[in-house]
Amino acid sequence: MVADVLLTHFNQLFCLNDPGHPLTGQEMKKATIVEDGYIAIKDGLIVALGSGEPDAELVGPQTIMRSYKGKIATPGIIDCHTHLVYGGSREHEFAKKLAGVSYLDILAQGGGILSTVRATRSASFDNLYQKSKRLLDYMLLHGVTTVEAKSGYGLDWETEKRQLDVVAALEKDHPIDLVSTFMAAHAIPEEYKGNPKAYLDVIIKDMLPVVKEENLAEFCDIFCEKNVFTADESRYLLSKAKEMGFKLRIHADEIASIGGVDVAAELSAVSAEHLMMITNDGIAKLIGAGVIGNLLPATTFSLMEDTYAPARKMIDAGMAITLSTDSNPGSCPTANMQFVMQLGCFMLRLTPIEVLNAVTINAAYSVNRQERVGSLTVGKEADIAIFDAPNIDYLFYFFATNLIHQVYKKGQLTVDRGRIL
């Protein structure tokens, strides 16, 4: 077979054999590092991988040849938890955070999520589209090729749908692949204050059926937290969403452990997000139910908290984990997955291989894209992040700097030395 594109002489390729399930426990520690590696691409797919000189049959007169001595390649990075589409920003809350005002106290003062809800409700489709596109551009420039994007800053149908429509438009227009999550249950809107059940009924009866009918989202999510939605309320919504055919995610055990992990396990959610306050019993329940733990260390960093999710304990117990940005205007205003990956080493005490497995193959399972992306595997799409680093460890050792040299998306050179092509 003659390749369209042949990428050769990488110092290292980060490869693994996809076992057909998210990596857990000791599997997280394993990968194949191919020295002097090459990748052959045809019709946007990986058709060959190896070490040394490529087979002669891969090279034809039209084959584009590129050498990458001194560089490493990984699968395109996957950010599987973002709040991509929103209006406004919340830098005015930064001084309060520095003064020690808690996230929940800011929310109680009318700030936090509700502040962004007001800004998002007043924002036009074009405003939201352009703002979200800028964030996606930034992510792409840092090696991200697939992004999960939640609604949740409307808390009314008109605005929630506008957010979902923006995600759908960007999925068509932007090189990054987007996976849509419906999260109208991100907070209790002011007009339903004191009556969350009534709001959930509106979501179930009036919103979810339209989202499903118009194929606006693949997943449904809810914020199960103290002063937001209880475990029973979360179970009520997610069970109805599951009956309608949605895959499930849940924000759980971020600030307090109030039963969100139990809901995730009972309903076989694909992932439970945050988990800073998870208990040993909660870890065991998620393992038993096969729920992926989606950890968001940049949120803990941004909130200046001391309690990070117990990633080391989770992996050693046999749990599958991912790492994501939680990109949002309040608790985590970043879109830099390289920073998140480095926090995975510095703050969660994970190894570079564990982090890379978390943000590639496990993240692909978290967004139900494992058949297409998440590993450098023959037959999968050629989503490739190429770093200006001599080896895998350097990517974490030399921190707080964008080390992306190039990005390939579906076999097309999409980012080249700081420029989107």
UniProtKB/Swiss-Prot annotation:
Catalytic activity: 4-imidazolone-5-propanoate + H2O = N-formimidoyl-L-glutamate
Biological process, per Gene Ontology: L-histidine catabolic process to glutamate and formamide; L-histidine catabolic process to glutamate and formate
Its EC number(s): 3.5.2.7
GO CC terms, sorted: cytoplasm
Essential cofactor(s): Zn(2+); Fe(3+)
Record text on cofactor binding: Binds 1 zinc or iron ion per subunit.
Residues that bind Zn(2+): 81, 83, 251, 326
Enzyme class: hydrolase
Transmembrane segments: none
Residues reported in the UniProt entry to bind 4-imidazolone-5-propanoate: 90, 153, 186, 254, 331
Localisation: Cytoplasm
Keywords: Cytoplasm, Histidine metabolism, Hydrolase, Iron, Metal-binding, Zinc
Matching InterPro entries: Amidohydro-rel, HutI, Metal-dep_hydrolase_composite, Metal_Hydrolase
Function recorded in the entry: Catalyzes the hydrolytic cleavage of the carbon-nitrogen bond in imidazolone-5-propanoate to yield N-formimidoyl-L-glutamate. It is the third step in the universal histidine degradation pathway.
Protein name (record): Imidazolonepropionase
Lineage of the species this protein comes from: Bacteria, Bacillati, Bacillota, Bacilli, Lactobacillales
